Amino acid sequence: MSSHVPSFLRGTPDMTAHGGDGKSRNVAGLMLAAIGVVFGDIGTSPLYAMKETFSGPHAVAMDKGNILGVLSLVFWAITIIVSFKYVIIIMRADNRGEGGSLALLALVSHAAESNRRLSLMVSALGIFAAALFYGDSIITPAISVLSAVEGLQVAAPHLEQWVVPLTIVILFVLFAIQSHGTDLVGKMFGPVMLVWFLTLAILGIRNLSHAPSVLAALSPHYAISFLFREGWHAFLALGSVVLAVTGAEALYTDMGHFGRLPIRLAWYLLVLPALILNYFGQGALLIYNPEAIANPFFNLAPASLALPLVILATLATVIASQAVISGAFSVTRQAIQLGFLPRMEIIHTSEEEMGQIYLPFVNWLLMCMVMVLVVGFKTSSNLAAAYGVAVTGTMVIDALLVGTVMLLIWKWNPRKVKWLIGGFLVVDLAFFLANSIKIPDGGWFPLVVGGLLFTILTTWKDGRKRLLARLKADALPVEDFLASLSDRVPRVPGTAVFLTGTSEGVPIALLHNMKHNKIVHERVVLLTVIVEEVPFVPEERRLENRLLAPNFHRVFLRYGFMESPNIPKALAHARTDQLGFFYEPMSVSYFVSRETLLPTEKPGLRGLRDTLFATLARMATSAMDFFHLPSNRVVELGSQIEI
């Protein structure tokens, strides 16, 4: 890392970007890649942010004073929330290079485990932030693509009635190609978004020349005077101003893919200047041409370039949507690995990049929800009301979680933390409260989605915890099992691997195999997969073998929450001295237990949660598919458990 880079941009020395081959790539290449993935959401906000402030349901009067006031609010919101809070502060709180709500939750939970009350509060906040992310993942593709296609109203007014149908077609194609991966088209994301941000800057500069006086709005004086002068109307305007910072959390979430330094450099050198120039260009346009408020972004360009701009904007919003969809896949895998969701089918779409995954269930569910939003809300203006609630809610939670990191992990001075986080919360809560006014107009949607997913995430986590405790309590101790083994029990050649979720006792599948088949394999392995609260586990720590008796092993396979467990691959890669025996794939049989959960009648909420847990368990992907076990070597034994 070059010595001329300012220290506040560098991050900690251990911060590296990791791809599928685990090798760091050059900073310039990572910057270009980050421009194509990380900044899609915030980079397409100019399509609708200014328009909503002056023409939305809570619009403010459009005079020069108010335009300067709104521009000042936009500039300082981006400066405080994105440039300072996320880029400088929150991006320092990585979990071994990974960012995002669940990675931050895993980091903080470990530090707070000695304080039960704090641990529960932190867990609830982190889980709700992850739940809100899914609401954002549904809204972003809908509002982004819709706002781009709405440019046809300027470029080709006679096609206005085709805005919604075209949006649906574009989104359907986007979701349909997910199963094929984005390896090929993904290489175009960076160059396309580079052209997009340069276009934003050029359009802004072109219009600034007509009213350069708008640059005075860089002074916070205009933001403060606007708030005091307009009062309630200015407060409501915050609900639209916050649209300029939607996507800020992506800088933190995608940190593991590109590294801290490339994201920071891309932000300060390209994305931030382009956004500010474009917003101020829109402000200048509205001063000298108030009629442009119908769609200020597309009116920045000459009429002859309106259609090419619509095409470029559509490409940019598709890329932004792709980044959000890929993020939903990644967060879902994290949630599964950390025990917040049942197993789902995870398909790797690239042999080189292990981060490129496809989850069919998540993909088609997202598509259906996005289509419902487009058809139901019809315009980006209507969707804007739903957008801000999820974003501002996540911003508040991120501030609280990073404050916990400052106190428990970084050991910062409590007074310093109080003032810093307090300042962030004043800004975040102001935006959140302004957006809460929009709840009846569509803001209810991300809250409903977040509430449903919070219930699912917590129900599964709590249910698995209680189920494993029950299995552990009922399990026969290994010592008793070994002592009860008679020499008369036939031993058959080969190795039997019994998967078990607990690290103690004998798996139910082993007892059932003994009961029904009356045999024991010459070598028995009790295998438990453990997911640690880190993104990746080094290969040298992957496998741990404990010899419980001659030819009777307990094996632990450790993975991080960003990895997909592959049991046969892990066993094949293990050394013979590490594993304790020679691994021969064709001599191994895998035994898995499939529990059928039977909820008992319980009054109130507990009964409903038990029923939900049992339903989720039935929907879970089989252990055979999830752990990549060869189907012709698997024996599945069922059991019924009352909960």
From Swiss-Prot:
Name of the protein: Probable potassium transport system protein Kup 2
An annotated GO cellular component: plasma membrane
InterPro entries linked: K+_transporter, K_trans_C, K_trans_N, Kup
Keywords: Cell inner membrane, Cell membrane, Ion transport, Membrane, Potassium, Potassium transport, Symport, Transmembrane, Transmembrane helix, Transport
Major localization class: membrane
GO function terms (MF aspect): potassium ion transmembrane transporter activity; symporter activity
Pfam families: K_trans (PF02705), K_trans_C (PF22776)
Family per record: Belongs to the HAK/KUP transporter (TC 2.A.72) family.
Membrane topology: Multi-pass membrane protein
Compartments reported by the entry: Cell inner membrane
Region (Disordered): 1-20
Function: Transport of potassium into the cell. Likely operates as a K(+):H(+) symporter.
